[in-house]
Amino acid sequence: MSMTICSNTPGAYPEIGAYNEVDKQLESSGFSSDSSLILNKPEVRQYWSSVSSHISRSGDVFTNDKEKISSSIGEDAMDIDASPSLIEKYNSFPTRKILPEQDEFENDVEDDASSSLKEKSQGSCEIEIASEISSEILNGTSADGNSEFHDFAEPPPSQNESVALSFSQSNDLDFLNNPSGSGSSNDINRSTSSISLPRHVSLDFNVYNSLCLTNEVTASESHNVAKFHLGKENKKSLLPRWKTIEMYGEVVKKTQDIYSNFQYAQYILRVGLDTEKLHELVKELEDESNSFTVDSLKEYLVNDAKVILKKLSAVGYPDAQYLLGDAYSSGVFGKIKNRRAFLLFSAAAKRLHIESVYRTAICYECGLGVTRNAPKAVNFLTFAATKNHPAAMYKLGVYSYHGLMGLPDDILTKMDGYRWLRRATSMASSFVCGAPFELANIYMTGYKDLIISDPDYAMALYEKAAALGHTESARILEDARRSGGFVSRGHPPSAQKYHKTSHEAVAAKKLI
């Protein structure tokens, strides 16, 4: 094989050709006999002179084209750079605080810790295009009630965001470059615990989920397995479980790793809300002088988790903000505080925490901690739905198809709702089991000539919803079984549920 350069196209890419007679090609190609990839000096000068002349002619053509454009639009317009760099574009946005409403819940944090954290977070935070898009969610409603960020269906994640992570004096300012903000930038393979579903970083601990397992949870299971194999007589050779929790907490609190602190807070909150584990720990502490009762141990663990989550929330860690807001909204710390929960959800939503975006939409929809605002609720639901949040897709589909929450009752909106329900059905789970039911109701009756009625497919959707735990679908299947497989094709239950009288429609418009 030899490499030859076309003589008639100076400056072009080399041609590679395979020849059978290699010796003849070396003699006729003009290359030196030392190597087929080395040109002689005269050939080099001739080649590069032709290349330079070709480049100069191309530059003249570009200059002539530029003169023609400048003559048509003006010299001043040509001097302006039409495509500024991304850094200049990002820096042109007004600076916003990560947590503007943090005064509501930051007062309970220790003064020395919160002051140092504020200085670090304010000094190291850089505005991003993703945070600009998320801030448009809060103030993104036009005069006609429509969203102003429909073009931002897929916003880019943060790439250069840095936040002070430590609780004391530290030089560690690294932050994981993803919207949820879990872990550190030195470990890009560390998975985040915000997977846009309530059970992943929520207080619903009845459902087993491997994505929520921390190191301490794994150690607890290993401890139980060791006790089982050692037997009751030899189990005293193991370190008590409460002692390991205390040691783990002491080590974590001394570290500067924000992810480890969040894992520890999540674990002790899980233990504090699990009555069975609390009884096991109380039995281990019976022989000690400072033994706990079940209530006192629960209060101790929950308060310890609360302090850690507040510190993490003060530095803008979205997973901690969401978990703390979920605890406030569910009354884990005593009284339900919807206002604090809303502030935490909205703060995490500004950092593109998708589950927090959905919870903020629920707050605006139901008036939890904030005045009811249907357009803002629809805006938040739209943003969460575009990020594949199943519950947001389900709610947005229902509202769009039935013309609720101030959405127009026209054909285009109905078809948008139909498409959202189809996407939600493909991602249906035990938490979002209503999407197949609503889609089945649509296929039972159809819609004009756009959605053809298909009772067989509707029954399959009812079966899917019933298998996921939807009671109304199970009732419809039971009625069909009793009637010999016949299902009425009249108005489905959802159509009767969402049907509005004239007085209700007027009241809804006044509310919006």
Swiss-Prot record:
Cellular component terms per the entry's GO annotation:
cytoplasm; membrane
Annotated spans, Disordered: 101-122, 144-165
Annotated Pfam families: Sel1 (PF08238)
Q: Which SMART domains match?
A: SEL1
GO BP term, pick one: cell wall organization
Briefly describe its induction: During sporulation and at high pH.
**Keyword list, A-Z:** Cell wall biogenesis/degradation, Cytoplasm, Membrane, Repeat, Sporulation
Q: How does it sit in the membrane?
A: Peripheral membrane protein
Return the Sel1-like repeat spans. Answer: 318-353, 354-389, 390-429, 433-470
What are the Acidic residues biased-composition ranges?
Answer: 101-113
Where is this protein found?
Cytoplasm; Cytoplasmic granule membrane
What domain of life does the native source organism fall in? Eukaryota
What functional role does this protein have? Answer: Required for the activation of chitin synthase III (CHS3) activity during the sporulation process.
* Homology family: Belongs to the SKT5 family.
Name the record gives this protein? Protein SHC1
Q: State the species of origin.
A: Saccharomyces cerevisiae (strain YJM789)
Q: Which gene encodes it?
A: SHC1
